[in-house]
């Protein structure tokens, strides 16, 4: 999406840029938490923080998708830009899902 945006010479609005930064910060937080859980002893770990971050990511994604529909409808920016924007948001959300999968696998108890 970033490459496509550059190829088409499209600029994100300041609001979109800020929203993407916020989502990327949450995914970065999720990755950092995952790394902490992977390094520590399994018996001393829990998934509470991982789930909290994942819930924040999902909530932000849902809010941004709804806002995007309104912004495109109100011609704040065009459909192509809105699609690229939401593609990036969706990819970040998928990364959050993958983090949860890794943490669940790491903390799964045998037997």
Predicted regions and their residues:
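Cytosolic, long alpha-helical scaffolding segments
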Residues: 1-111
């Amino acid at each position: 999406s970033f490459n496509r945006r550059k190829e088409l010479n499209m600029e994100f609005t300041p609001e979109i840029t800020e929203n993407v930064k916020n989502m990327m910060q949450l995914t970065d937080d999720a990755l950092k938490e995952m790394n902490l859980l992977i390094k520590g002893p399994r018996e001393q770990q829990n998934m509470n923080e991982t789930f909290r971050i994942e819930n924040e990511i999902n909530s932000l994604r849902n809010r941004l998708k709804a806002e995007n529909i309104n912004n495109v409808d109100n011609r704040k920016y065009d459909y192509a830009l809105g699609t690229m924007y939401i593609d990036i948001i969706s990819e970040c959300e998928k990364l959050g899902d993958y983090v949860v999968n890794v943490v669940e696998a790491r903390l799964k108890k045998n037997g």
